[in-house]
């Protein structure tokens, strides 16, 4: 992803194209409305908002939107902004855990959650500000935890999400188990991408389909009737 972004940026400069990645401030202006919707639909400010973090556009933008609501007097406090990254791609979570003043890029990030497989997030500093200014935190989850939560969300909620989206819910589970999140907190967890954004991951976990002859006896046999 990081090299692809560099190439696209170069292409925009040399060929006059318009970059709509999270480096684009107008994109963040759109993403900040997630914060507006949260407050509008809940009718209150949650204690915590948890988001998956890759390029860190969402967590930065939501924090910006909520700050605007605070400045306008629509809310009286900010929720704790909490980011979740994959263990193999976690420059922001590492900076939070180690108390680093800046995010140190990771040269070779690796995770099954491709949407957050980003070693040099363009909004890293904004994300650090969002987390630290609100008393939030950041954590990591393994690929195994991500895949397990992806299955749980589908089975228990009927929602198909891509692996990166499942990371945010898996992160809550991890933080609760570690005692970093109070069970009584009111939490909004953002799942950002649909299952069809990355269907190959789910297909790879499924048993191969059974092929039978087109007759009733073969069907009954396959169904163990």
Whereabouts are the PLM-identified features?
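Beta-strand segments within the central parallel beta-sheet cores of soluble alpha/beta enzyme folds
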Residues: 47-52, 77-84, 184-190
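Active-site/ligand-binding loops adjacent to catalytic centers
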Residues: 1-21, 26, 68-160, 202-225
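Short glycine/serine- and small hydrophobic-enriched flexible loop segments
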Residues: 40, 64-68, 170-177
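A structured beta-alpha segment of the ubiquitous adenosine-cofactor-binding alpha/beta core
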Residues: 20-43, 70
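Catalytic phosphate/nucleotide-handling subdomain of diverse soluble enzymes
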Residues: 169-225
